[in-house]
Design a protein with these regions (language model features):
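Phosphate- and other anionic-substrate recognition elements at nucleic-acid/protein interfaces
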Residues: 1-127
Length: 127
């Protein structure tokens, strides 16, 4: 028996996160701060899968905190997402449309993606 995931796409910016839930078709905006992210993650079901576009360093807090809470997290390259948008005939490029596109991408292509996991501790020391 396959357990279905609760799929959420999150568009990340320096100041704000915009999420879109595939199952409920609801959008939500929150500040890109650890306290706000923590509150938002606490509201998500345990079987949530989150798809995020790699955005400089602004996505790291969300990705790391979601991973620590046990969520499946998928980090997508912006170039890959841009090509996916073109492939499905998408033209809009807003935070809300990006969040929706990320959720759709994970829903349709998720079986081909590998969940994110933190790099080895030695990597942090090298930086």
């Amino acid at each position: 028996m396959r357990v279905e995931k609760f799929i959420i796409g999150v568009d990340v910016a320096k100041v704000e996160l915009v999420s879109y839930c595939e199952e409920t078709a609801q959008q939500h905006s929150l500040k890109n701060t650890k306290p706000e992210i923590r509150k938002w993650l606490a509201l998500q079901p345990a079987n949530t899968a989150i798809c995020v576009e790699a955005t400089n360093v602004y996505h790291l807090d969300l990705v790391e905190m979601a991973y620590e809470k046990g969520f499946a997290v998928y980090v997508v390259d912006g170039y890959q997402l841009s090509n996916y948008r073109k492939g499905i005939g998408g033209r809009a490029k807003t935070d809300a449309s990006d969040a929706c596109l990320l959720a759709r991408f994970l829903d349709r292509e998720g079986s081909l993606l590998r969940p994110w996991s933190p790099p080895p501790a030695v990597y942090s020391k090298l930086q």
